[in-house]
Amino acid sequence: MDLELFDDDQLLDDKHHDLIKKLVAFCGKQLKLPENTEMSITLVGDDEIERINREYRETDRVTDVISFAIEEGEDDLPLLPGMAKNIGDLFIDPLTVRRHAEDYGHSFERELGYTVVHGFLHLNGYDHIKPEDEAVMIPLQKKILAAYGLTR
């Protein structure tokens, strides 16, 4: 996995940056994605995540993660052999992640991991709006977190 991680406001320390990078690589292996798969994660604060949520999802509130998947359509050009595939971008608000960790009574690392895996699965076509989709996504999310060692 080729991950671009942006933290212009230094919302997290190097230890947490490393956790994100390692977890994304682990997720890529769990889903058997090609090694040259690309994505980005941008860490933002409450004001920015609320603005993005309002502008792109028409929801005027903060949230922990917003995903923008790059989905292939019939008009897309086929990838050349060895060419990287970009699956999309995540915007994560560590401040909201920290509040969720406190609300749920577990570590910030576990909640950050949950948020990264959850967003990663969305970038790969998983969803949880319909019960039948949720029945696939949530167990996979739990399986990945447990295999990585991030349990409640």
Curated annotation (Swiss-Prot):
Record keyword Repeat present: no
Location in the cell: Cytoplasm
SUPFAM superfamilies in the cross-refs: Metalloproteases ('zincins'), catalytic domain
Co-factor(s): Zn(2+)
InterPro entries on file: MetalPrtase_cat_dom_sf_prd, YbeY, YbeY_CS
EC number: 3.1.-.-
GO biological process, one term: rRNA processing
GO molecular function ontology, one term from the record: RNA endonuclease activity
Principal EC category: hydrolase
GO cellular component: cytoplasm
Cofactor binding notes: Binds 1 zinc ion.
Alphabetized UniProt keyword annotations: Cytoplasm, Endonuclease, Hydrolase, Metal-binding, Nuclease, Ribosome biogenesis, rRNA processing, Zinc
Binding-site list for Zn(2+): H118, H122, H128
NCBIfam families attached to this UniProt entry: rRNA maturation RNase YbeY
Family per record: Belongs to the endoribonuclease YbeY family.
Reported function: Single strand-specific metallo-endoribonuclease involved in late-stage 70S ribosome quality control and in maturation of the 3' terminus of the 16S rRNA.
Protein name: Endoribonuclease YbeY
The species this protein was found in: Lacticaseibacillus paracasei (strain ATCC 334 / BCRC 17002 / CCUG 31169 / CIP 107868 / KCTC 3260 / NRRL B-441) (Lactobacillus paracasei)
Record gene name: ybeY
